[in-house]
Amino acid sequence: MAFSRCKFCGDSGVFPFPVISKKGVTEYFRCKECMAISLSDKEHLPLSQQLARYRQHNNNLNDFGYAHFLTSFVYHTFSFLAPFAPSSILDYGCGPNPALIDLLHLVLKRQQDHGSFTKSTDFNGIDSVEKCIDFLAFFLSYLPKQELIYGWDPFFSPNGKKEPANLVLCLEVAEHFGNPWEGFSGLAQSCTAEGYVAIGTLPIPDSIVSNMDFKGWWYKDDKTHVSFYTEKAMVECGKTCGLRYMGKASPRIFIFKKLGDA
């Protein structure tokens, strides 16, 4: 089905942006105003297939590449927010294997072991999972108690969410939002007033102008990825639910602050 309004900014200037391949035509739509891209609702995978795909994700802390990816997200987010020290942290959309929570718990334990870790400020020198933990243990001046670092996922941990946290981490989740406004509303409801939301997702590169450009972009090939953002689309989604855009912590990390009266 065609969208009468953009799912991201609400503008009426939405046009077909199909991807044509040997397998056929996959329907996407793009907004002329915010330039975000949505997969047509009729192309969304059934829930059972989405769950099967999520279970295939290799989100394992023993994988150095993935551990380094998580470390980068934490490092850039906390660097941007400094000197803010969260009193609670929620991993929103933590999946079947809450690796980000596990990493922060390991960092907290390392800190509690009376500083028995290698003290390094060289992010580029990290070359092992242990060094990921050591680096964050030294870099993060404060973490809340373990029970105040928790996760929630609509499929795998629907009862995990406790009280709203004052730091909500949302890594590789926003691209799965079938309805971005609803997704952002969930993030806002999970955050305390004056708290922060950090969203990690790969934005649409400036080089993607035509649907032929988009066809070659690898990030769309995961069929559970249905929403693709520009920075402007991020800003507009935040406006719908009282999340004020603060800027980018890195090219793929977007920081918001929950307004006190939202």
Where are these regions (language model features)?
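Post-transcriptional modification and biogenesis factors for structured RNAs
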Residues: 227
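Juxtamembrane/transmembrane-helix boundary motifs at the membrane-water interface
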Residues: 209-217
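A short SAM/SAH-binding and catalytic strip from SAM-dependent methyltransferases
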Residues: 169-180
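Conserved beta-strand signature within the Rossmann-like core of class I S-adenosyl-L-methionine
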Residues: 194-202
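Helix-to-beta-strand junctions that scaffold the AdoMet/dcAdoMet cofactor pocket
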Residues: 177-178, 191-193
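Conserved N-terminal segment of class I S-adenosyl-L-methionine
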Residues: 1-167, 181-186, 200-201, 214, ...
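Active-site micro-motifs of SAM-dependent methyltransferase domains
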Residues: 156, 175, 204
